[in-house]
Amino acid sequence: MRVGDVLEVRASAENLRAHRRGVQVDLVTEVSTGGELVYRGVSTYLAKGFRLPSGEEPLPEQTDEVPREDFVPPFPTARWALGSGTGRAYGAISGDRNPIHTSTLGAKAFGFPRTIAHGMYTAARALAEVGAARGDAYDWTVDFEKPVLLPGTVQVAITRTPDDAAHPGGFTYVGWNGKSGKRHLGGTVTPR
């Protein structure tokens, strides 16, 4: 992609399905230029407590949930100290001023004990921790688990993956709560 390229953007909701806790849907965004797909992003959302209109209940094999292995925190390579204003600061930049990120009262109304960090803030910060070694073009994945309560501290580990066909020169990253050992997020960065 170059400055001045005409971009074609397609967004869709796909794969509406029952989940044991509600309903899941994939929101897909694709960006093309000159007929070539240059970006594809898939975000999966869960609407807790909702059911499909058909009343369909998920069968165990339909849940799309892979049992997670017990998390054993690795040796941290970074530590983030996030202040209580992190959500407000990121919201001012991103435009996402959701009350769960900006107001303790708003966060409590949605079931959180205090404000939480934006998921994309933590994901982008982990990507930045990988640094320039990721290259200019890369595939990036992120899986969110437990929200980061603000103020809070996140332990982070960036690990280079073995050079193989699946992850040539890539990286994995994980962020967790150093006190509870609960994982906040994890993912991969693979240069193209």
Name the predicted role of every residue range.
Residues 1-79, 148-150, 157-192:
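HotDog/MaoC-like acyl-thioester-processing domains
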Residues 6-10, 22-24, 58-61, 94-95, ...:
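A short linear-motif detector with a strong N-terminal bias
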Residues 22, 34-37, 71-73, 81-84, ...:
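Residue-level signal for the start and early helices of compact helical domains
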Residues 41, 88-89, 124:
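Active-site-proximal helix/loop capping residues that flank conserved catalytic or ligand/cofactor
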Residues 45-117, 131:
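Catalytic strand-loop segment that frames the active site of acyl-thioester-processing enzymes
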Residues 100-101, 105-162, 169, 175-176, ...:
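Catalytic-pocket segment enriched in acidic/His residues
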